A protein has these predicted regions:
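Short charge-dense sequence patches
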Residues: 24, 75-79, 107, 136-149
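Short Lys/Arg-enriched alpha/beta "domain-start" segment
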Residues: 1-38, 69, 78-133
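N-terminal accessory interaction module
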Residues: 37-48
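Conserved binding-pocket/active-site segment within a compact domain
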Residues: 119-168
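Short, charged/polar micro-motifs that form catalytic or ligand-binding hotspots
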Residues: 63, 112-115, 142, 146
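Proline-rich intrinsically disordered, low-complexity coils
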Residues: 65, 84, 101, 136-138, ...
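Intrinsically disordered, low-complexity regulatory segments enriched in Ser/Thr/Pro
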Residues: 47-72, 159-168
Length: 168
């Protein structure tokens, strides 16, 4: 008997179907994507991913990427403004329009995890940022701008723990 799909698999399947309903030619223009008859190609953290035009499946050198990667791509296609343009300014997560409901989860999952993993390990964090194609920033003990997509960067500003403060 075939096992039921996980909630994650169901969410990906729903979004895959949404992708198939999107105007792919409009996505190519909007995000300046490479494309051919079979696929669209998008660069995500310096890796070129393939999105099959017929079935909407996303692959990274033939392997399906994880849930977060797939959802970031589908959500970017679906929710981006009609004419997305970077402001050129780096802003705190809480200052991004319409993210307030997600800030607690962001702190709990992303921020606390970064603090836990990289506290006392600045060299490792710098290496990870460089592997992701990051460019150094002068702020923090480790500061980098990371290219999520060619049209969207994020900044990681990390201060290591010391005798007065926890890592942040």
């Amino acid at each position: 008997m075939k096992a039921d799909r996980s909630n994650y698999e169901q969410v990906i399947e729903n979004w895959r179907q949404k992708f198939l309903d999107m105007d792919q030619d409009a996505l190519i223009r909007k995000f300046n994507l490479e494309a051919d008859e079979e696929a669209l190609y998008i660069t995500y953290f310096s890796r070129k991913l393939r999105i099959d035009r017929r079935d909407g499946r996303i692959t990274d050198q033939g392997v399906r990427p994880g849930f977060d990667t797939v959802m970031n791509i589908y959500n970017t296609f679906y929710y981006a403004a009609e004419h997305p343009a970077a402001s050129g300014n780096l802003v705190a997560f809480r200052q991004v329009k319409r993210v307030y409901p997600f800030e607690a989860a962001y702190r709990r999952t992303i921020i606390s995890r970064l603090q836990e993993i990289f506290s006392g390990k600045i060299a490792e964090l710098k290496k990870a940022c460089e592997i992701l194609g990051g460019t150094p920033l002068p702020q923090g003990d480790a500061g980098y701008v990371l290219p999520v997509f060619p049209f969207l960067n994020i900044a990681v500003l990390f201060w290591d723990k010391d005798e007065e403060f926890d890592a942040q």
